Amino acid sequence: MSSGGLLLLLGLLTLWTELTPVSSKNRPPFCNLLPEPGRCNAIVRAFYYNSRLRKCLEFPYGGCGGNANNFKTIDECQRTCAG
């Protein structure tokens, strides 16, 4: 690769790093999990962080099981994952 190409690549990587939100670098890994309704049959209002859309969304939680990307309130989800 030519020195001009390397310089362009370095510039693009630097720009991408600067534009990536700081919070995503410190976001807990479980925030990237898909919502998991669990194994029970209750329908409980819960929230999960959608890493593709970069926001918290509501989903029907079964009441038990599931994963750590499961919050009782949208505020808790936003503080933990969207911060």
Swiss-Prot record:
<feature type="disulfide bond">
    <location>
        <begin position="40"/>
        <end position="64"/>
    </location>
</feature>
<dbReference type="InterPro" id="IPR050098">
    <property type="entry name" value="TFPI/VKTCI-like"/>
</dbReference>
<comment type="function">
    <text>Serine protease inhibitor.</text>
</comment>
<feature type="disulfide bond">
    <location>
        <begin position="31"/>
        <end position="81"/>
    </location>
</feature>
<dbReference type="GO" id="GO:0004867">
    <property type="term" value="F:serine-type endopeptidase inhibitor activity"/>
</dbReference>
<feature type="signal peptide">
    <location>
        <begin position="1"/>
        <end position="24"/>
    </location>
</feature>
<feature type="disulfide bond">
    <location>
        <begin position="56"/>
        <end position="77"/>
    </location>
</feature>
<feature type="domain" description="BPTI/Kunitz inhibitor">
    <location>
        <begin position="31"/>
        <end position="81"/>
    </location>
</feature>
<keyword id="KW-0732">Signal</keyword>
<dbReference type="InterPro" id="IPR036880">
    <property type="entry name" value="Kunitz_BPTI_sf"/>
</dbReference>
<dbReference type="InterPro" id="IPR020901">
    <property type="entry name" value="Prtase_inh_Kunz-CS"/>
</dbReference>
<keyword id="KW-1015">Disulfide bond</keyword>
<dbReference type="Pfam" id="PF00014">
    <property type="entry name" value="Kunitz_BPTI"/>
</dbReference>
<dbReference type="GO" id="GO:0005615">
    <property type="term" value="C:extracellular space"/>
</dbReference>
<feature type="site" description="Reactive bond for chymotrypsin">
    <location>
        <begin position="41"/>
        <end position="42"/>
    </location>
</feature>
<protein>
    <recommendedName>
        <fullName>Kunitz-type serine protease inhibitor C</fullName>
    </recommendedName>
</protein>
<dbReference type="InterPro" id="IPR002223">
    <property type="entry name" value="Kunitz_BPTI"/>
</dbReference>
<keyword id="KW-0722">Serine protease inhibitor</keyword>
<comment type="similarity">
    <text>Belongs to the venom Kunitz-type family.</text>
</comment>
<keyword id="KW-0646">Protease inhibitor</keyword>
<keyword id="KW-0964">Secreted</keyword>
